[in-house]
Regions:
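Short secondary-structure boundary/hinge segments and terminal tails
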Residues: 86, 122, 172-173
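An amphipathic, basic-hydrophobic helix/alpha-beta surface used to engage anionic
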Residues: 1-95, 130-137, 150-151
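Short glycine/proline- and charge-enriched loop/turn segments
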Residues: 41-42, 95-101, 178-185
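Hydrophobic alpha-helix feature that most strongly marks membrane-spanning transmembrane helices
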Residues: 27, 69, 105, 109-112, ...
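Short, contiguous acidic/charged loop-to-helix segments that flank catalytic cores in large enzymes
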Residues: 49-53, 107-111, 134, 138-143, ...
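Von Willebrand factor type A / integrin I
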Residues: 143-200
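Well-ordered alpha-helical segments embedded in enzymatic catalytic cores
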Residues: 60, 118-122, 147, 197
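Von Willebrand factor
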Residues: 96-132
């Protein structure tokens, strides 16, 4: 109808929501110190992908931050364990990635257990409006880390919570290899009992 009243064609363009808040929390605690990948046997070579889980977490935070900043969102990055190790907040545009890389360059994994209540309080102090909160950590086995579950529950009352976790391809391969070995052993045992004439 607007085009009918105007001499020019009116077009409605869709533009995604902007100025949302995105908070990325990187776990620097004990879980982040685990190596992803297996070291190569050669002493003179470095296997690509063999690094602490923290490295993958920092890369995730930088990538998410750059994408969200480019989309026009307000990005806040936190790295913590028992205390806040790095924080980037309130920086927009092209300066964001440089500031984030500088803030994270001194962050190393610690052997402390991550204080997830600290993460909750830091997120609440950082953003007052509903936000997307990305927790970059190892997903604990079901029911094992009660503090983590309580933190996720507390954050999800007000925010949308996403958990990002890197998996170790060598552990996944070992898990499937172990299952395969057990299945073959069970089949071999079954075959031997059949050959021996042992009844069930």
């Amino acid at each position: 109808r607007a085009s009918a009243r105007s001499k020019e064609l009116m077009v409605r363009t869709w533009r995604p929501e902007r100025d949302r808040h995105v908070v990325v929390v990187v776990d620097c605690g004990r879980a982040s110190a685990a190596l992803l990948g297996a070291p190569d046997a050669g002493a003179d070579t470095i296997e690509i992908g063999v690094a602490p889980r923290l490295d993958s977490g920092i890369e995730t935070a930088l990538l998410l931050g750059a994408l969200a900043t480019r989309a026009g969102d307000q990005v806040h990055l936190l790295a913590l364990d028992q205390r806040v190790r790095a924080r980037v907040s309130g920086i927009r545009g092209g300066a964001f990635l440089g500031a984030a890389a500088t803030a994270f360059q001194e962050v190393v994994p610690s052997l402390d257990v991550t204080d997830w209540q600290l993460a909750v309080s830091q997120v609440r102090a950082t953003v007052r409006h509903p936000a997307l909160v990305v927790l970059v950590t190892r997903v604990p086995p079901a029911g094992m880390d009660v503090d983590f579950l309580e933190a996720v529950r507390a954050l999800s009352d007000r925010h949308t919570v996403l958990i990002a976790s890197a998996t170790d391809p060598d552990q996944d391969r070992a898990r499937t290899d172990a299952e395969d070995v057990l299945m073959r052993a069970a089949a071999a045992l079954e075959e031997r009992t059949d050959q021996a004439g042992v009844a069930d």
